[in-house]
Curated annotation (Swiss-Prot):
Domain Lipoyl-binding as annotated: residue spans: 16-98
Cofactor: (R)-lipoate
Entry's Gene Ontology cellular component terms: cytoplasm; glycine cleavage complex
Cofactor note: Binds 1 lipoyl cofactor covalently.
Function in brief: The glycine cleavage system catalyzes the degradation of glycine. The H protein shuttles the methylamine group of glycine from the P protein to the T protein.
GO terms under biological process: glycine decarboxylation via glycine cleavage system
Family: Belongs to the GcvH family.
Record gene name: gcvH
Protein name per the record: Glycine cleavage system H protein
Length: 121
């Protein structure tokens, strides 16, 4: 698992990256009440808006940690947005992206680096 400073995570299997938000981000948002995930076929660049998550506190963009084509959005979140709070780093994923440039992963943090980053906030 790799992480961004915007609190997204990515897990790569082969050439497919599964993307979500971290437990820290979910905790900061509070109770998630709405999620808009991308549709298959959407092409995203690293750092661009990928999804939207709304909570009782705020609406936030979820940014693509990698570039590529969305092959699946997690449609189950529309009917069960609370999954983002309950399972932020597993079942609460937002999208699966076919990687365009695997080298982008090198710029992301591993868990130890991410936890050290959280310590600076």
């Amino acid at each position: 698992m790799r992480f961004t400073k915007d609190h997204e995570w990515v897990i790569v299997e082969g050439d497919v990256a599964t993307v979500g938000i971290t437990a820290y981000a979910a905790e900061q948002l509070g109770d998630v009440v709405f999620v808009e995930t991308p549709e298959a076929g959407k092409v995203v660049k690293q750092g661009e808006g990928l999804a939207v998550v709304e909570s009782v506190k705020a609406a936030s963009d979820v940014y693509a940690p990698v570039s590529g084509e969305v092959i699946e959005g997690n449609g189950e979140l529309a009917g069960a947005p609370e999954t983002v709070n309950a399972l932020p780093e597993s079942g609460g994923w937002f999208a699966k992206i076919k990687l365009a440039n695997p080298a982008e992963l090198d710029a992301l943090m591993d868990r130890d680096a991410y936890e050290a980053f959280l310590g600076t906030l």
